[in-house]
Every structure is written in C-alpha cells, then in structure tokens.
C-alpha cells in the first residue's frame, strides 16, 4: 500500500538516453577504504569454494556481491552477519570483503557497468528504421555501418600540425639513415608517432561517429534543414506548375518523388534535433563508452544439480562482451606494438558482441546456442507480448480492477459506459462501506460488509450515488497508443457485460465479437481530475498520430441511417401535385380494410405523433411516404429552389408547390401551412437530433 502522507519515491518511468556520468552514478559505491566499486571486470559468475563447499560469486564478476549487494540479507561474502538498519542510517560494509550489509532485494535494482576499451555504437540508434544517427549526420545507413565495423575511415581536414613529411625529427639520430624508403616506412609504422598521426588525421569505428556527433550544432541543423526544405519546396512547385499530369515526363515525376523523399528526411532531421534540444540530451550519448549491466535478479542463474546450472541468455552475452573487451583493452594498453589489423578486427568483434547483447535479431551476426536457437537479447526481454513491460508490468493484476466482455450500447452517450452491477459493487466496496458508516447505517466495517454481501436495497441506492461522481477507466490490450485507455461515466446495468458506445471502438481497436476489456478505478483526486479533463472519451475525438477524426460512423451506423431515411424518391410530381389523394384532413382513423383499398396513395397527418402511431400499429411502413402538416413557426423553408407550380384560388389562397413540399398561404387570415412529404424514418432521425441539441444546450447553460 502506498502511504499517502509520504512523498512517493518514483513519479514516472521514462526510457531514453543517459550520460556516462549517470551510468556511473547508478553503479558506483565508495567503500570505507576509499575504493570505488561498480565496474564489472570479470566475466565469470560463480566459483567453487572448498572451505564452505558452496559456489560463491566471483569478485568483480557478473554476480559480485560487492557491486550488486549480498545474496542473503545482512550476510556478507565472508559469512559475517549484521542487523540491517534503516536507509537513513549510515551505510555499513564488511571490512574484509567490502560487501554492504543491506537487504538482498537490492540485487533487483543495483546496477553495474562495463568500461569499454573504445566507443561502441548503440545498435538501436544505428540500424533501426529510421536511424537517428544517420538522420543527424545526414549520411547513409550503409556508409555508417561500414564505418562502425571498420570497413571505412574518415579522413580529417588538413591542419598546420606536423605531417608525414615533417616527422623525420621524431626518429632517434641513429635510425634516421636508411638505405631505402621501404625501410623508413616500415620503421615509422611501428612508432608511437605514427599512432598519433593516425589518430589525428584518420578516424574509424564508433569513435569517429562520436566525434562528429559531439561537434554538431543542433540549432544550425534546424535552420539549415529548414532553409533546404524551403528550397526543395520551390523546386517541387516549379516542376508541378504544369496543369495536368499528362504533360509531365517520367523524368520529372522521378525528380518530384526524389524531392519529396528529401523533404521527409529534412523534416525528420529537424524534429530529431528539436527533440534533443528540448530534452537536454546530447547526441554523442548514442555512442556507448560505458555499458550498463542489469541487476543479477533480472538475469538469474539456477543450480539444477551439483555440476549443472541454468543461466539467462543475457549472462552468456555479457560474458562475450567482457572477455572480448578485456582482450582489446590489453592490446591498447600493452607495451608491445600490436598491428593495426589485429586492433581493427578486435574492435569489430567487441562491436558485434555489444550488438548481440542489445538486439540479437538486427545485429549483423546473430548469436545462437547449440540448438541453433537465437539467444534472447535485451530487446527480446523488453519487447513483445511476453516482454517485461506487457507481461510483467502492464499485464499484472492490480487492485480495484475488473474484466468482462464488451457489447454494443447504442443508447449510451459518448462519454458513458454500461458497467455491470456485480463489478461495480466489488470495485466501489470501500466507498460504500465509508458511506454506510458516515450515514450511521452500519456500526462497523464488519456490519457494512455483511450488508453488501446480502445486497440490501440501501446498498444499491448508495452505489448509484457513488457511481454518479466517480469515473472509471476502460482499457483494452494491447495498449498501443494513448487511446487504448479512456475514461467514462459508468451507468449501472443488470447484465454481466460492459456496454460500450460504438463510436469509441476505433480508438480501442475493438469490435463486438467477444473482445474483453478491463475496468480500472482511479482512486486519488489527482487521478480523477486527470480522467475528467484529459482521458474522457469526449476529449479524445482526434487521432494522436495524424490528427484525423477517430470517432467516425461505422458501416453499421451508415447502413442504419440509410435504411432509416430510405423513402420514395419520386417526388411530388409523381402524384401530379395532388395533396388530397386521401381525404384525411381531420386525421380520421384508417382501418386495415380502407388502407388496403388506398394502396399506392399517400396519406396526410396533422402531427408527427399520429404518423408514428400509425407506424406502430403497422398501418404504414418505415419508408412509406406521407404528407405531414406543420405550422409556419415550426419550420421555415430556406432554399433557393423555385416552385414547380403555383395555384391561385378565388378566396385569396395560393399554393406554392416544390419538389418535396407544398406551402399554402392565405391573404385574408395571414395563415401559412406547410405540407412536407416525408417518412417515419425521417421523423425518428429528426427527433434524435432535436434531443441531442436540447441536451447540448442544457449542458452549455
């Protein structure tokens, strides 16, 4: 349970780039002796201790207790135990082994790091589409991959520093006299002077990319990309100035497509540079200098027999990185000269090992086990339906939640959902108990629970009151975007299914063929305010991806509207303007016998209720045309349509006949009548629109 009187430790979860200093801050610990631990230097996991006849973690290894914490709470690697104190108390360490006396649960979140001998590219930002590194540097992905894997090199600009021709003074005097240029070159390639020249004038690998990323000016990138985008837009307009597509040649069409692709690249580059500026993230962090090591509990190892262990695939991939990185580090720091080809090959091996650890599927050389199965990399553990986010974090059962099948609720408002009473009774149980005790309807919590269990009438009344002021959250897995979870006002139903308005189905990507949805209850006032202001379905009418309307009528709705408004399209001319085919000005009762004899003739009704009553008595069909008399104050004809014919009578009355209506005007009485040719379906639709407008006006007022 979260203590509401204590400031929560974590407010949000964000995935992104971090600096090397932050990675070190996560892992480093300072021992009382002044030694800093946190770097994983040994690729071994456990070793057999003959004294205790048990397996213990290797020092500075992947399961080191000094780095990640003790395996048993309060027990160090030496076997000494001490009482675990509060987090606010001073940290205590073992004087012999340097293990901190803390709870063993620290091994679930304490991290380590691997110090890479040379910078390595992060495969997520290099090989994934779109490639962020390629977008920022405005280079091709293939060229950058060749550079990372040492197939290409960057040649630096000319400087005023010594070059090859002026480095003769770097040799000892006794070795400057050689008979031939080949001997001079071979001797020079083995000196440190050549290494300095190579590092200054040429660069390869991820280190070269890191230098270019560090020298980028993001504001200049934004302005230059915008200027080029405007220039490309003008070029595109010059080609498209021709009125018809047939006048353009195939070459011009190819130029237009090429310009469009370039404009899309420029837009992505500007957005990426703007994102780096807003988040205060440096682009060179996409090149790794320190590789984080996950806590041991997230990559466990199990003992199944005396000599057999089962380990996570991550441990195998970490071992490969550490062992190859150690070889590279020894080669770079060694006193002996190492040929450039060996260094290049070893750096490429380390880069491949890092790629396999981060994402084994998109790495150039995926690593497999004995059964030819791919090792599960860091990306495989996070992504997918069985990944850590969807299965362990998002897929876990939580309190104050329920689940049921969804069915269509066309009578609901857009912000409402039908919630089964059984689910609501369980979700709002604590609120009902509090209300029963406050109103002195129950003397204790036990008595209130008994009343809820027996489902007394007062319980349902209180539930109705509580539900009116409390929103609920509906979620359908998988939650691919923010519209996958929305807030609704619950309406209690006696059924066991959740009723959902059909217009919100597109946001959830749901249909009514047996889909299930989860119900969550926001508890705090902040969560309820967020649900009302941001998460209500009426606040999410547009798609967050492209801004298009997401609450659009479905095919069922369009078919229903078509059927509802389907009628005789022949118009008034089909009856030769004869409004009185059926002499029924007084709206007399039409029995079945008479109605059968008037087949093909159109009836007249003085008000909509009589027409709807005749439909319910099956006197007319849903699409049967009839004449409806309305007063001038209720409807006004606003149209530029000219009358088909005008009839003038001797008593001063004249009839203006239009396509689907007839207006009767009287000069003496100044009375106006309108006869509309319509159907019952149109009446139903008109009433629904009027009710919706009345409800909208009431809420606005």
Curated annotation (Swiss-Prot):
<dbReference type="GO" id="GO:0000287">
    <property type="term" value="F:magnesium ion binding"/>
</dbReference>
<dbReference type="Pfam" id="PF04997">
    <property type="entry name" value="RNA_pol_Rpb1_1"/>
</dbReference>
<keyword id="KW-0808">Transferase</keyword>
<feature type="binding site">
    <location>
        <position position="78"/>
    </location>
    <ligand>
        <name>Zn(2+)</name>
    </ligand>
</feature>
<keyword id="KW-0150">Chloroplast</keyword>
<keyword id="KW-0460">Magnesium</keyword>
<comment type="function">
    <text>DNA-dependent RNA polymerase catalyzes the transcription of DNA into RNA using the four ribonucleoside triphosphates as substrates.</text>
</comment>
<dbReference type="GO" id="GO:0003899">
    <property type="term" value="F:DNA-directed RNA polymerase activity"/>
</dbReference>
<protein>
    <recommendedName>
        <fullName>DNA-directed RNA polymerase subunit beta'</fullName>
        <ecNumber>2.7.7.6</ecNumber>
    </recommendedName>
</protein>
<feature type="binding site">
    <location>
        <position position="97"/>
    </location>
    <ligand>
        <name>Zn(2+)</name>
    </ligand>
</feature>
<keyword id="KW-0934">Plastid</keyword>
<comment type="subunit">
    <text>In plastids the minimal PEP RNA polymerase catalytic core is composed of four subunits: alpha, beta, beta', and beta''. When a (nuclear-encoded) sigma factor is associated with the core the holoenzyme is formed, which can initiate transcription.</text>
</comment>
<dbReference type="InterPro" id="IPR042102">
    <property type="entry name" value="RNA_pol_Rpb1_3_sf"/>
</dbReference>
<dbReference type="InterPro" id="IPR000722">
    <property type="entry name" value="RNA_pol_asu"/>
</dbReference>
<comment type="similarity">
    <text>Belongs to the RNA polymerase beta' chain family. RpoC1 subfamily.</text>
</comment>
<feature type="binding site">
    <location>
        <position position="513"/>
    </location>
    <ligand>
        <name>Mg(2+)</name>
    </ligand>
</feature>
<dbReference type="Pfam" id="PF04983">
    <property type="entry name" value="RNA_pol_Rpb1_3"/>
</dbReference>
<dbReference type="GO" id="GO:0005739">
    <property type="term" value="C:mitochondrion"/>
</dbReference>
<dbReference type="InterPro" id="IPR034678">
    <property type="entry name" value="RNApol_RpoC1"/>
</dbReference>
<feature type="binding site">
    <location>
        <position position="511"/>
    </location>
    <ligand>
        <name>Mg(2+)</name>
    </ligand>
</feature>
<dbReference type="GO" id="GO:0003677">
    <property type="term" value="F:DNA binding"/>
</dbReference>
<keyword id="KW-0548">Nucleotidyltransferase</keyword>
<dbReference type="InterPro" id="IPR007066">
    <property type="entry name" value="RNA_pol_Rpb1_3"/>
</dbReference>
<dbReference type="GO" id="GO:0008270">
    <property type="term" value="F:zinc ion binding"/>
</dbReference>
<feature type="binding site">
    <location>
        <position position="76"/>
    </location>
    <ligand>
        <name>Zn(2+)</name>
    </ligand>
</feature>
<keyword id="KW-0240">DNA-directed RNA polymerase</keyword>
<keyword id="KW-0862">Zinc</keyword>
<dbReference type="InterPro" id="IPR045867">
    <property type="entry name" value="DNA-dir_RpoC_beta_prime"/>
</dbReference>
<feature type="binding site">
    <location>
        <position position="515"/>
    </location>
    <ligand>
        <name>Mg(2+)</name>
    </ligand>
</feature>
<dbReference type="Pfam" id="PF00623">
    <property type="entry name" value="RNA_pol_Rpb1_2"/>
</dbReference>
<dbReference type="GO" id="GO:0000428">
    <property type="term" value="C:DNA-directed RNA polymerase complex"/>
</dbReference>
<keyword id="KW-0479">Metal-binding</keyword>
<dbReference type="GO" id="GO:0006351">
    <property type="term" value="P:DNA-templated transcription"/>
</dbReference>
<keyword id="KW-0804">Transcription</keyword>
<dbReference type="InterPro" id="IPR044893">
    <property type="entry name" value="RNA_pol_Rpb1_clamp_domain"/>
</dbReference>
<dbReference type="InterPro" id="IPR006592">
    <property type="entry name" value="RNA_pol_N"/>
</dbReference>
<feature type="binding site">
    <location>
        <position position="94"/>
    </location>
    <ligand>
        <name>Zn(2+)</name>
    </ligand>
</feature>
<dbReference type="GO" id="GO:0009507">
    <property type="term" value="C:chloroplast"/>
</dbReference>
<dbReference type="InterPro" id="IPR007080">
    <property type="entry name" value="RNA_pol_Rpb1_1"/>
</dbReference>
């Amino acid at each position: 349970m979260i203590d509401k009187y204590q400031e929560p430790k974590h407010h949000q979860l964000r995935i992104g780039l971090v600096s090397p200093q932050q990675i070190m801050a996560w892992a480093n610990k300072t021992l009382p002796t002044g030694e800093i631990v946190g770097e994983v230097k040994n690729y071994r996991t456990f070793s057999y201790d003959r004294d205790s006849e048990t397996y213990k973690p290797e020092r500075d290894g992947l399961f080191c207790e000094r780095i990640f914490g003790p395996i048993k709470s309060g027990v160090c690697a030496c076997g000494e135990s001490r009482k675990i104190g509060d987090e606010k108390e001073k940290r205590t360490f073992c004087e012999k082994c340097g293990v901190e006396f803390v709870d063993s649960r620290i091994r679930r979140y304490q991290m380590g790091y691997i110090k890479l001998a040379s910078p390595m590219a992060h495969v997520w930002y290099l090989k994934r589409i779109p490639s962020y590194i390629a977008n920022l540097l405005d280079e091709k992905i293939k060229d950058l991959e060749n550079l990372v894997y040492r197939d290409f090199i960057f040649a630096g600009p000319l400087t005023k520093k010594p070059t090859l021709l002026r480095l003769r003074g770097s040799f000892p005097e006794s070795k400057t006299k050689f008979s031939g240029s080949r001997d001079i070159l071979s001797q020079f390639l083995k000196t440190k002077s050549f290494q300095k020249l190579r590092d200054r004038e040429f660069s390869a690998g991820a280190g070269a990319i890191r230098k270019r990323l560090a020298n980028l000016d993001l504001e200049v990138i934004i302005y230059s990309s915008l200027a080029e985008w405007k220039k490309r837009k003008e070029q595109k307009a010059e080609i498209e100035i021709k009125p018809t597509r047939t006048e353009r040649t195939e070459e011009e069409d190819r130029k237009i497509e090429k310009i469009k692709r370039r404009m899309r690249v420029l837009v992505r580059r500007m957005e990426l540079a703007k994102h780096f500026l807003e988040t205060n993230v440096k682009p060179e962090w996409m090149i790794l200098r320190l590789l984080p090591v996950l806590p041991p509990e997230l990559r466990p190892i199990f003992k199944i027999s005396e000599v057999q262990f089962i380990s996570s695939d991550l441990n195998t991939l970490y071992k490969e990185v550490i062992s190859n990185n150690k070889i590279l580090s020894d080669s770079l720091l060694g006193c002996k000269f190492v040929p450039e080809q060996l260094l290049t090959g070893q750096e490429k091996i380390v880069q491949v090992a890092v790629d396999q650890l981060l994402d084994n599927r998109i790495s150039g050389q995926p690593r497999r086990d004995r059964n030819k199965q791919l090792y599960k990399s860091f990306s495989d553990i996070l992504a997918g339906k069985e990944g850590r986010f969807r299965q362990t974090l998002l897929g876990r059962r939580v309190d104050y939640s329920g689940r049921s099948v969804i069915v269509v609720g066309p009578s609901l408002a857009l912000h409402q959902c039908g919630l089964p009473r059984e689910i609501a009774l369980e979700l709002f149980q604590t609120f009902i108990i509090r209300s029963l005790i406050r109103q002195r309807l129950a003397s204790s919590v036990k008595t209130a629970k008994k009343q809820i269990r027996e489902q007394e009438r007062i319980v349902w009344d209180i539930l109705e009151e509580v539900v009116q002021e409390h929103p609920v959250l509906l979620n359908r897995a998988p939650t691919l975007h923010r519209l996958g979870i929305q807030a609704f006002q619950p309406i209690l139903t006696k059924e066991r299914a959740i009723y959902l308005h059909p217009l919100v189905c597109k946001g959830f990507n749901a249909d009514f063929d047996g889909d299930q949805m989860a119900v969550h209850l926001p508890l705090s006032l902040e969560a309820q305010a967020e649900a009302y202001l941001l998460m209500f379905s009426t606040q999410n009418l547009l798609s967050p991806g492209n801004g298009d309307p997401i609450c659009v009528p479905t095919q069922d709705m369009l078919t229903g509207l078509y059927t509802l408004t389907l009628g005789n399209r022949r118009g008034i001319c089909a009856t030769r303007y004869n409004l009185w085919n059926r002499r029924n000005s007084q709206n007399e009762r039409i029995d079945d016998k008479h109605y059968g004899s008037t087949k093909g003739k159109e009836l007249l009704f003085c008000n909509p209720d009589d027409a709807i009553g005749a439909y319910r008595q099956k006197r007319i069909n849903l699409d049967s045309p009839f004449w409806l008399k309305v007063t001038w104050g209720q409807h006004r004809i606003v149209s530029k349509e000219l009358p088909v014919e005008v009839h003038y009578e001797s008593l001063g009355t004249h009839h203006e006949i239009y396509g689907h209506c007839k207006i009767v005007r009287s000069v003496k009485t100044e009375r106006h009548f309108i006869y509309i040719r319509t159907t019952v379906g149109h009446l139903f639709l008109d009433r629904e629109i009027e009710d919706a407008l009345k409800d909208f006006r009431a809420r606005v007022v």
